[in-house]
From Swiss-Prot:
The lineage of its organism: Bacteria, Bacillati, Chloroflexota, Dehalococcoidia, Dehalococcoidales. This is Glycerol-3-phosphate dehydrogenase [NAD(P)+]. It comes from Dehalococcoides mccartyi (strain CBDB1). It catalyses: sn-glycerol 3-phosphate + NAD(+) = dihydroxyacetone phosphate + NADH + H(+); sn-glycerol 3-phosphate + NADP(+) = dihydroxyacetone phosphate + NADPH + H(+). One of its GO terms (cellular component) is cytosol. It is found in: Cytoplasm. SUPFAM superfamilies: 6-phosphogluconate dehydrogenase C-terminal domain-like (SSF48179), NAD(P)-binding Rossmann-fold domains (SSF51735).
Length: 359
């Protein structure tokens, strides 16, 4: 029987464990304390977990012993907040073997380094195991998946062989996995879309309508593609499941934590108050800060990100930020066959309509 070790008793970690265990594979969840492991093992569910009728499937168990959790695993799947990825992979690294896949299911960028999660993992494990790193990302709202509703995801790795091996372990009824070798694009799509989801929450909180939200999502995708291209991603990846697909799901659903934060900001609540009272992490808050600094250092114009940053960190009025975003100047909107997204978003002193590259 195949075995998957999941690091992180988060909502997403438990959801992924449930998917995998329902397929008849052994899943071992690692809990950080004996008390947590005992409680989860006894109740077979988290105390505050929804839906109410949820219980761990037969082949999913919990342990506080990291060695027991990792031993014999075909994959170690890290479903932890992005700012906790480095300390967790440091604990796991000495227990890895050359045959184990190491999969990140986190959607964020590390504060201070601006690194993607696969880069953080690479920093902390033996170079001999780097070929086994993969990432999971896509339009995956946990509560829908736990209700048995269909969803798809993307498994990305540097090689198609590794991506397919990971996808085979993850794929189950109502949860299909596509593969991709553009690990940069898949990770950036999953991370950066959370910024736009914050904006979508603001638009919804202000009751600005679907026209405004569709404009925000579309311009947000252009920003994601511009930054992604500058960092080495394939822009086509960002129009796929891990980019546009995840963007639509997160911006359209009340189940999204980042969308929730955006809505609450329009009610006059402070960011600290919102975050303090949330049981889960809204990754978009930290990702906005990282992406904002990256854009500045690369001289990339990212107006959506800049305005969301000002709302989060400079106490800008959400209503004024939305007005600025909807009051764009008449510039070229098309991305043609030979359009250079990086140059298109380079800041220009004279805001002229950019010219298409000649044939």
């Amino acid at each position: 029987m195949s075995k998957v070790c999941i690091i992180g008793t988060t909502t997403w970690g438990i959801t992924l464990g449930t998917i995998i265990a329902h397929k008849g594979r052994e899943v071992m969840l690692w809990a950080r304390t004996e008390d947590e492991a005992m409680l989860l093992s006894t109740q077979r569910r988290p105390a505050d977990f929804l839906p109410e009728n949820y219980h761990f499937p037969e082949f999913m168990n919990v342990t506080a012993c990291l060695e027991e959790a990792v031993a014999g695993a075909d994959m170690v799947l890290l479903a932890v907040p992005s700012q906790r990825m480095r300390p967790n992979i440091r604990l796991v690294a000495p227990l890895l073997t050359k045959s184990m896949l190491i999969c990140s299911a986190a959607k964020g960028l590390e504060i201070g380094t601006a690194k993607r999660m696969s880069q953080v993992i690479t920093d902390e494990i033996s170079p001999d195991f780097a070929k086994n790193i993969c990432v999971l990302s896509g339009p995956n709202l946990a509560m829908e998946i736990l209700k048995g509703l269909p969803a798809v995801t993307v498994l990305a790795a540097d090689t198609e062989k590794t991506a397919k091996k990971a996808a085979k372990l993850i794929t189950a009824a109502n949860f299909s996995a596509y593969t991709n070798t553009d690990i940069i694009g898949v990770e950036l799509g999953g991370s950066l879309k959370n910024i736009i989801a914050l904006g979508a929450g603001i638009v919804d909180g202000l009751n600005l309508g679907n026209n405004a939200k569709s404009a925000l999502i579309t311009r947000g995708l252009t920003e994601i593609s511009a930054l992604g291209a500058a960092l080495g991603a394939n822009p086509l990846t960002l129009s796929g499941l891990a980019g546009l697909g995840d963007l639509i799901a997160t911006c359209s659903s009340n189940l999204s934590r980042n969308h929730f934060v955006g809505v609450e900001l329009t009610k006059g609540r402070s960011l600290n108050d919102i975050m303090y009272n949330m049981s889960n992490v809204a990754e978009g808050v930290s990702t906005t800060a990282v992406a904002y600094e990256m854009a500045r250092s690369m001289d990339l114009e990212m107006p959506v990100t800049e305005n969301i940053y000002n709302v989060l960190y400079n106490n800008a009025d959400p209503k004024e930020a939305a007005r600025i975003l909807m009051d764009a100047q008449a510039t070229h909107e098309l991305a043609g066959r030979k359009w250079n997204l990086f140059k298109m978003f380079r800041k220009r002193k004279a805001r002229k309509t950019p010219e298409l590259n000649p044939d």
